[in-house]
Design a protein with these regions (language model features):
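Rhodanese-like catalytic fold shared by cysteine-dependent sulfurtransferases
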Residues: 1-18, 25-56, 65-151, 158-191, ...
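Active-site neighborhood of phospho(di)ester-bond hydrolases with catalytic His/Asp-centered motifs
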Residues: 61
Length: 235
């Protein structure tokens, strides 16, 4: 991910990257980055021929959340060339960057070989994303859900977790999620979080492809939780 707008612009220009806007078509038509091709998040799996596998690709959405879902999904399909711009359209426009309303058609690319089981799992995840984009809501909603019995997972690194975590949270570091499947509940709602929400958005597709469709993400994550003065625990 490239979170700084100037660094993002430099990276796109230097690499002649392909820009993918994964917002809904109506959002895209109201304004987008010049040259960005619109592939709404839920349709990514059906439009892989619009995404190159061998040149840099940057994905963005409105706030960064959908871009994380898209980046993680595409990487599971073998697109290691995909990065994201987490500030999204909000960050781009707040920085006073130019807005285009001219639709970009993009090119057609050869789709790489993907294991059929993985393609099916990822595409099933993408096409069934509900309204709300699998977000657990704001801090108030998350606190109420935890109070009501939702399980909590922390996808940050062990040192971050050791410095303090949301009460009852179990640490399942992002890069090691598949090794923790035995500790992920299947019979209750699960809310996962990180520090800022970015890693949480990357984690959602991983949990769901592993079969845990009861997992939602807390987009505000630990920063929003502590900013709200909510309690924390330490090991």
């Amino acid at each position: 991910a490239v979170g700084d707008t100037t660094a993002f612009k430099d990276a796109v220009e230097a690499s002649n990257a392909v820009l993918i806007d994964v917002r809904e078509t109506g959002e895209y038509e109201e304004g987008h980055m010049e040259g960005a091709v619109n592939i709404p998040l839920r349709t990514l799996g059906e439009n892989l021929d619009k995404i190159p596998a061998d040149t840099p690709v940057f994905v963005y959405c409105k706030s960064g959340w959908r871009a994380g879902l898209a980046t993680s999904s595409l990487r599971m399909l073998g697109y290691d060339n995909v990065l994201a711009y987490p500030p999204g359209w909000n960050g781009w426009t707040e920085a006073g960057e130019p807005v285009s309303t001219e639709a970009a058609t993009g090119e057609t690319y050869e789709v790489p070989e993907i294991a059929p089981e993985m393609y099916t799992a990822v595409n099933d995840f993408l096409t069934t994303i509900p309204e709300g984009w699998l977000s657990a809501g704001d801090t108030e909603k998350v606190a109420a859900a935890i109070e009501a019995g939702s399980a909590v997972l922390d996808v940050r690194t062990p040192p971050e977790y050791a410095d303090g975590f949301i009460p009852t949270a179990v640490n399942t570091p992002l890069r090691e999620i598949p090794t923790f499947i035995d500790v992920i509940p299947t019979d209750t709602q699960v809310i996962e979080y990180c520090k800022s929400g970015w890693r949480a958005s990357l984690a959602i597709p991983i949990y769901h492809v592993l079969g845990f469709d009861n997992v939602l993400g807390y987009s505000g994550s630990y920063l929003a939780w502590t900013d709200a003065g909510e309690p924390i625990e330490t090991p």
